[in-house]
Amino acid sequence: MSDETPNEGMDTPLADSFSEIRLEDLSPDLRTACERAGWPSLVPVQAKAIPYLLSDRDVMIQSRTGSGKTGAYLLPIMQKIDLQKNVVQALVLVPTRELALQVSQEALMLTAGTQLRT
């Protein structure tokens, strides 16, 4: 383990090189998906994490349950999928069956009405 690895629970803010993103900054399909999910705007964890993920940066998010973490990584995944490629382009791994079901339900809700498959 490197000395540069943050300790668990350490409050390490994201660098200021990326500005927060707003719902209006997303593609029309993603805005529609958010509306379908009942999200009138992005929550703070999404607004801060999505620009990093869209820039192919690795992000580790620690936030309370129900804070929007799942949407924070599903929305950039959906944005980056190339519909012209008929291959698996993303894989989400989670530690429990219960969490897998929750993530699957959210992915199904967000991809409903799109050409994306889960």
Language model features: what each stretch is:
Residues 55-61, 86-90:
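Pre-Walker A (Motif I) flank of P-loop NTPase domains
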Residues 27-32, 39, 85-118:
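Conserved nucleic-acid-binding Ia/Ib motif block in the N-terminal RecA-like helicase ATPase lobe
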Residues 57-77:
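Walker A/P-loop
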Residues 1-57, 95:
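N-terminal intrinsically disordered, low-complexity tails of helicases
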Residues 47, 72-73, 91:
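Hydrophobic alpha-helical transmembrane segments of integral membrane proteins
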